[in-house]
């Protein structure tokens, strides 16, 4: 089921402008606005154009190395065909789901989302994909499930970064079930109308726009429904710095730097930092998920 969310960003806000400003893509990027059920609340200022190369070369994907340019340099080693996703745990129809079979059942739409890294840099990216809720509906969520766990591919011969104990491999992440079912939560299959590049998490990655980027796990091979909070790689490695929730919050700093502002990629060396928005600008849509919670404690 597609088009359940109104997009408040426009093609002028996308990074880079030149890769998107043609009629087909502009119309696709705006098509969901009149059909969605959710209204975006935050207004984004116009961003300076950025190059396609920056989007596909400035990445965190430690399976290929810890440098920002390592994923672009080494991700060509990754073989993404064939690809399947194991869906198990508390589901009615567990099994190995072929990626192409999943695509054939989904309506692919384009979502223009802000992307905020925990390292205090940001972009605006037009993703292609489908709502995670639709994939979970395909598998059938059992009563009593409370969380969704995700796992990245672990294939050292194709992912040279996994040869080093930077993290405990494979990379793992998790969401509460209500977060996973939220209409903003996307399973991305592409960007800018093209298939997802390897360095950006091909062929299938999670995008949760109100959370820091490391929650948006890449190259997913397993999804598990469970009644217990699942392990998450950065939370396991440094729990006092990376919480399970990791919602974008300018009022809760990382122990080693401020989260009150961010550096927009493509803004230039002397560009002014931008104030970070609560929940990355999606407060109206998602704040209700955390009503009554101490967001400094459950960071």
Curated annotation (Swiss-Prot):
Pfam family, one: Oxidored_molyb
NCBIfam families found in the cross-reference section: PRK05363.1
The protein's name in its UniProt record: Protein-methionine-sulfoxide reductase catalytic subunit MsrP
Family: Belongs to the MsrP family.
PANTHER family for this protein: PROTEIN-METHIONINE-SULFOXIDE REDUCTASE, PROTEIN-METHIONINE-SULFOXIDE REDUCTASE CATALYTIC SUBUNIT MSRP
EC top class, as a word: oxidoreductase
Compartments it resides in: Periplasm
Organismal lineage: Bacteria, Pseudomonadati, Pseudomonadota, Alphaproteobacteria, Rhodobacterales
UniProt xrefs under HAMAP family: MsrP (MF_01206)
Signal peptide from the UniProt entry: 1-44
UniProt modification remark: Predicted to be exported by the Tat system. The position of the signal peptide cleavage has not been experimentally proven.
Keyword entries, A-Z: Metal-binding, Molybdenum, Oxidoreductase, Periplasm, Signal
Subunit structure: Heterodimer of a catalytic subunit (MsrP) and a heme-binding subunit (MsrQ).
């Amino acid at each position: 089921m597609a088009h359940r969310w109104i997009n408040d960003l426009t093609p002028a806000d996308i990074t880079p402008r030149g890769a998107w400003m043609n009629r087909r893509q502009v119309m696709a990027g705006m098509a969901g606005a009149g059909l969605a059920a959710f209204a975006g609340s935050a207004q984004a200022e116009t961003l300076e154009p950025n190059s396609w190369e920056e989007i596909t070369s400035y990445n965190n994907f430690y399976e290929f190395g810890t440098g920002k340019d390592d994923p672009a340099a080494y991700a060509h080693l990754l073989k993404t065909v064939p690809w399947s996703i194991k869906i198990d745990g508390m589901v009615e129809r567990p099994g190995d789901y072929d990626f192409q079979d999943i695509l054939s059942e989904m309506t692919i739409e384009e979502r223009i989302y802000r992307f905020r890294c925990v390292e205090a840099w940001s972009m605006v990216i037009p993703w292609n994909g489908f709502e995670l809720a639709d994939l979970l509906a395909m598998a059938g969520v059992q009563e009593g499930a409370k969380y969704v766990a995700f796992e990245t591919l672990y294939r050292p011969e194709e992912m040279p970064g996994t040869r080093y104990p930077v993290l405990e491999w494979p990379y793992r992440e998790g969401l509460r079930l209500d977060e996973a079912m939220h209409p903003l939560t996307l399973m991305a299959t592409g960007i800018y109308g093209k298939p997802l590049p390897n360095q950006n998490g091909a062929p299938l990655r999670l995008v949760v726009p109100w959370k820091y980027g490391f929650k948006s796990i890449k190259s997913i091979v397993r999804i598990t429904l469970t009644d217990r909070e699942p392990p998450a790689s950065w939370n396991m490695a440094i729990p006092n710095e990376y919480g399970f929730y990791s919602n974008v919050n300018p009022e809760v700093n990382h122990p080693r730097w401020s989260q009150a502002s961010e550096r927009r990629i493509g803004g230039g060396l002397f560009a002014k930092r931008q104030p970070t928005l609560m929940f990355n600008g999606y407060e109206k849509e998602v704040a209700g998920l955390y009503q009554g919670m101490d967001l400094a404690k459950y960071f």
